[in-house]
Amino acid sequence: MKTGIVTTLIALCLPVSVFATTLRLSTDVDLLVLDGKKVSSSLLRGADSIELDNGPHQLVFRVEKTIHLSNSEERLYISPPLVVSFNTQLINQVNFRLPRLENEREANHFDAAPRLELLDGDATPIPVKLDILAITSTAKTIDYEVEVERYNKSAKRASLPQFATMMADDSTLLSGVSELDAIPPQSQVLTEQRLKYWFKLADPQTRNTFLQWAEKQPSS
């Protein structure tokens, strides 16, 4: 089963897609959702970048950084989930630039008024719309796809309506049973299709690292 999935991933991803923009990931940014789709943390773990096509994009993320306390101790600061929308038309690289976050005062200020910049490959600021994603769910585990869909339907500052319904039934990820020898449960199909989607976005080094990791996993 494991070898079959890895082989399928390679076969599906060999055709070269035309990507125009490299999103450079920051170690202080925990990416949660990209363009309405939950980010595959297992595939992007340790990745330096992912590839985007030209056009509008939306990121949902948290800033996570160790800050210094007044008593010389440290703690991990985790920001509220943030939404940023931007357009990569004619842009070949996107880089995060966060404000200084070193202590409790700066963290509290960021919570109250988040700010950041996205820079292109020439360090020129990219126009962005930034907002806090207010979570409505009281569940212990938050479904960020559902929260982002609700946000995008609410005409908020960083909303992008085109991503509001993309994940309603995952129809954009399910490619049809003709690719499969047998019809597995839909949850299995969806998991594999999500994996294929993020595999295609990952840079070559990350793909190779993931495949090496997958080969070492025990067969189910």
From Swiss-Prot:
Q: Which InterPro entries match?
A: UPF0319
Q: Does the keyword Signal apply?
A: yes
Which gene name belongs to this protein?
yccT
Q: Where is the signal peptide?
A: 1-20
The keyword Transcription regulation is annotated on this UniProt entry: no
For this record, an example GO cellular component is: outer membrane-bounded periplasmic space
Report keywords, A-Z: Signal
Family, as annotated: Belongs to the UPF0319 family.
Q: What is this protein called?
A: UPF0319 protein YccT
* Organism for this UniProt entry: Escherichia coli (strain K12)
